[in-house]
Amino acid sequence: MNGQNIRIRLKAFDHRVLDTSTREIVNTAKRTGAQVRGPIPLPTRIEKFTVNRSPHVDKKSREQFEMRTHKRLLDIVDPTPQTVDALMKLDLAAGVDVEIKL
């Protein structure tokens, strides 16, 4: 796999779970002899929702909720076939979205 890079993009709502999954991927890639660039923290997407507290009256009384999506980016430079096999077998935590581009 000469000259190829693997770009891994991770997303999660909980940054602690995201960081542990990122660490697992980095350790697995380094253990198989690949060079890793990152993890690069990407901007956190914050979605805010404003709703009425009461279903009937008091329009001025509102409550706000927010949902944060944390993201990380990893580049694996010149991966070996062992690296690809190890990454395919890796079991990550639930709640982490993984996008892989070759």
Swiss-Prot record:
One of its GO terms (molecular function) is structural constituent of ribosome. The keyword Ribosomal protein applies. Belongs to the universal ribosomal protein uS10 family. The keyword Transcription does not apply. HAMAP family: Ribosomal_uS10. Involved in the binding of tRNA to the ribosomes. This is Small ribosomal subunit protein uS10. SMART domains: Ribosomal_S10. Keywords: Ribonucleoprotein, Ribosomal protein. Part of the 30S ribosomal subunit. It comes from the Bacteria. One of its GO terms (biological process) is translation. InterPro entries: Ribosomal_uS10 (IPR001848), Ribosomal_uS10_CS (IPR018268), Ribosomal_uS10_dom (IPR027486), Ribosomal_uS10_dom_sf (IPR036838). One of its GO terms (cellular component) is ribosome.
